[in-house]
Amino acid sequence: MYQINLAIAGIAVGTVSLPVLSKALKNKNLKKIAAIQNKSFELSLLLSVPASFGLIFASDQIVNALFGYGTFSAIDVEMTAIALKFFGYGVPAFALIKILSNFFFARNNTRTPFYISIFIVFLNISISLSLFSKIGYIIIPIATSISTWVGVIIYLYLLNLKKSLMLD
């Protein structure tokens, strides 16, 4: 369910901004680069933050409306709603990852996003495996959200380090 928000907030914005950003970088138009990065970042957050709040605060109602019948028990609804709530905390990060990776792709740098993605996956798996026996299924959405936010921080750090991030 959180993937719908990712598709709208991250993938759509990223797909539209990548060719424009690539062209601005090729032309070394710093004002346009900054404007594209700002708009991409802002639009992504504008779409993903409200979606995140919706998933966090209305997860019970969403899951109940979609699955609260048939063989899906009340306990199943409750457990799924809790998982959705924790995925909700990661929605802005899921969208930002797509935007931030495009800042590298536009510069013909595919290695850095690849290595960051590998790190995020290993971090996610490590957190999940190390805490699954203590916390249970709920660690999976928690680990996914945490590892993705760590990825966002890494992207921002590396872009800032290379003076490639031009946000207001």
Spans of model-derived segments:
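Membrane-embedded alpha-helical bundles of multi-pass transporters/translocases
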Residues: 1-168
